[in-house]
Amino acid sequence: MTAPSASRLSLGIVALGAYTPERIVRNEDFEARMDTNAAWIESRTGIRERRFAAEHEYTSDMGVRAVQDMLRRDPQALTDVDAIICATVSPDALMPSTAALIGMQVGLVGAAAFDLSTACSGFVYGLSVASGLIHAGTARRVLVVGAEVLSKIVDQDDRGTAILFGDGAGAAVVGPVPEGYGFQDFVLGADGNGGSSLYMRSVAKQLPGGFAMGDFTGMNGREVFKFAVRVLGDSGTQALEKSGLTTADVDWVIPHQANVRIIEAAMERFGLPMSKTIINLDRYGNTSSATVPLVLREGLDDGRIRDGQQLLLIAFGGGLSWVAGTMKWWGGAPSLQPDRAAEHSAGVQG
């Protein structure tokens, strides 16, 4: 990749697409195979239903469909893109990278491509990394994809995890935006001491303490909840302070969609009403790295997110990891316009 020095460019999201699979799995569907009921699931998590990928639909497939949704809105969205980041913990394979497979299918052969694994923090991490590549003069524009097929790596008979997760994908292009718009600051971090609280056993056997080998995601829900409430508030506050902002300046908090109780606790920490955040986990569950772009796309399509608004992005995930970012939303690109008839809520078809 080659690009001119861009250290003073204002950078932000210049294109955005989303995809969710067609299959809807409701809380009631879990009642027949585990000790639970639909009302209990919703009261504990805020989730009513989620989407599951088809049998032969994988992360790269969904990432491609999110990019296709972007191109449907703006056929020129991939112009000058010379790097691809795919944030995922459910890659098609350990190698080749899912990012490379997506690039092959959307006409970006030759672009740098790599996967990023910070679980639910991944998409916002990816925005920060993409900005760094551009500011370093290494890339001109960067495609950031957050995509997951969590239904395939979660034990569907385990009440502690099966009820939480869904599948989906979002895709954004990071590039130059007009001065005064775009990303302001990011705060990123991780603490491996909490690695045993949220993990994928088959790739976690070398972590301190060790884990039994297996095929499914494991989670200590109580510990993750306490961690999330703390780091979302801390990192969000730090990002605002770095940007010279306060919570009074924030139009929308865009949180990772893990659990409505976590979001409520974070908003209380910020001293902001729930009307200042956007929630869609009731319909999609926790899609890990896809949650933030899915929320952004929904907020654009229904007209809540508008040009010039101040956003605070917050997420946490495996690692344990956390990230927060501030940005002044730029709505000037074709794919960033409202689309109330958007197909992604019912599954964009590639």
UniProtKB/Swiss-Prot annotation:
One of its GO terms (cellular component) is cytoplasm. The keyword Lipid metabolism applies. Residues 257-261 are annotated as: ACP-binding. Keywords: Acyltransferase, Cytoplasm, Fatty acid biosynthesis, Fatty acid metabolism, Lipid biosynthesis, Lipid metabolism, Multifunctional enzyme, Transferase. It is an enzyme of class 2 (transferase). It is found in: Cytoplasm. GO terms for biological process: fatty acid biosynthetic process; secondary metabolite biosynthetic process. It comes from the Bacteria. Signal peptide: none annotated. The active site is at residues 120, 256, 286. The keyword Acyltransferase applies. Pfam families: ACP_syn_III (PF08545), ACP_syn_III_C (PF08541). It catalyses: malonyl-[ACP] + acetyl-CoA + H(+) = 3-oxobutanoyl-[ACP] + CO2 + CoA. HAMAP family: FabH. Homodimer. This is Beta-ketoacyl-[acyl-carrier-protein] synthase III. The lineage of its organism: Bacteria, Thermotogati, Deinococcota, Deinococci, Deinococcales. The gene is fabH.
